[in-house]
Amino acid sequence: MSVPRVGVLALQGDTREHLAALRECGAEPMTVRRRDELDAVDALVIPGGESTTMSHLLLDLDLLGPLRARLADGLPAYGSCAGMILLASEILDAGAAGRQALPLRAMNMTVRRNAFGSQVDSFEGDIEFAGLDDPVRAVFIRAPWVERVGDGVQVLARAAGHIVAVRQGAVLATAFHPEMTGDRRIHQLFVDIVTSAA
């Protein structure tokens, strides 16, 4: 694969920022809102947003089943914040009955929604990230954390003693928003994963 076509799930969140970051890292980015667009990509970014709303938009657009199937077939994916929540196999504090975040089950992990607190508890800080020489500036907004990782999941970063970045095969997830800082190393890591998986 010379230039990977990487979709950004364009339901909520920093779609434009992810598209720009992917372009800067040598990918061919495109938005994904429909089944034919999902079928056309080599990989997918699931941005932040509100995980319960995103789940139900996926249902309404008839994308939840097809996305689960593509992920089960090995589609490389990167989820930031709400994207991390959705990629999990289990979600704690998933939301009110009938309006819960629905796991895509792409990673063998349990994630707790809004674990770091509400909007007013949002913060940023420098964190060590496995494989990167210098710390990453991480922006946490109503962020989740990973409560448990299972077999095959590599922990890449922690903040305040909690797991905030993980990888399982060609699937990457962060509790923070690298698209907001101008530091492209996380997106470059994902593009490299996509290229290697081809």
From Swiss-Prot:
Name the source's superkingdom.
Bacteria
Q: Name one GO molecular function term.
A: glutaminase activity
Q: Where is the active site?
A: 81, 177, 179
GO cellular component: a single term: cytosol
UniProt keyword Lyase present: yes
Entry-linked CDD domains: GATase1_PB
InterPro entries reported in the protein's UniProt record: Class_I_gatase-like, PdxT/SNO, PdxT/SNO_CS
For the keyword Transcription regulation, the answer is no
Which residues make up the binding site for L-glutamine? 49-51, 113, 141-142
Q: One GO BP annotation here?
A: pyridoxal phosphate biosynthetic process
Listed pathway(s): Cofactor biosynthesis; pyridoxal 5'-phosphate biosynthesis
Q: What is its EC number?
A: 4.3.3.6, 3.5.1.2
Reactions that this protein is recorded to catalyse: aldehydo-D-ribose 5-phosphate + D-glyceraldehyde 3-phosphate + L-glutamine = pyridoxal 5'-phosphate + L-glutamate + phosphate + 3 H2O + H(+); L-glutamine + H2O = L-glutamate + NH4(+)
Checking Pfam families in the record gives: SNO
Similarity section: Belongs to the glutaminase PdxT/SNO family.
Q: What is this protein's function?
A: Catalyzes the hydrolysis of glutamine to glutamate and ammonia as part of the biosynthesis of pyridoxal 5'-phosphate. The resulting ammonia molecule is channeled to the active site of PdxS.
Name the PANTHER family for this protein. PYRIDOXAL 5'-PHOSPHATE SYNTHASE SUBUNIT SNO, PYRIDOXAL 5'-PHOSPHATE SYNTHASE SUBUNIT SNO1-RELATED
Its name, as the record gives it, is Pyridoxal 5'-phosphate synthase subunit PdxT
Source organism per entry reads: Mycobacterium tuberculosis (strain ATCC 25618 / H37Rv)
